């Protein structure tokens, strides 16, 4: 089956209702200011301790990191392993499900590389029109 832009638009729109939208739900799982960075760090570094994640994901608060990690764990994208030590030792890593996002992130990265200059141009034109 050949998928063109019109087919993609139609299938996405037809699957979205007021109460359910699969594409929106998928973006909620991996999107936002912090989740993409957390997933990137875990995918590139493997097993990472909480404090190392906090240092690597610059600007995130401890509370926000905890919340985002819990959501990612709940969705099955990451695994949390607690070691019963003093002080507590907690490690995070990607699950197979989380690692399956790799091709999606690669496609988004490729799209960004191919279109970034056009996006900057559109932003400049928009901003210039506001002046």
Explain the meaning of each model-derived region:
Residues 76:
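Glycine-centered, phosphate/nucleic-acid-interacting loop/turn motifs that mediate DNA/RNA or nucleotide
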């Amino acid at each position: 089956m050949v998928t063109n832009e019109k087919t993609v638009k139609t299938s996405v729109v037809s699957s979205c209702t007021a109460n359910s939208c699969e594409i929106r739900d998928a973006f909620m799982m991996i999107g936002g200011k912090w989740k993409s960075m957390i997933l990137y760090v875990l995918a590139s570094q493997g097993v990472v301790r909480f404090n190392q994640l906090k240092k690597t994901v610059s600007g995130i608060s401890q509370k926000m990191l905890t919340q985002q990690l819990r959501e990612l764990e709940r969705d099955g994208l990451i695994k949390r392993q607690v070691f019963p030590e003093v002080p507590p030792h907690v490690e995070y890593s990607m699950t197979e499900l989380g690692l399956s996002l790799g091709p999606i992130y690669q496609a988004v990265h490729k799209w960004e590389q191919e279109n970034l200059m056009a996006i900057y141009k559109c932003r400049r034109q928009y901003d210039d029109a506001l002046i």
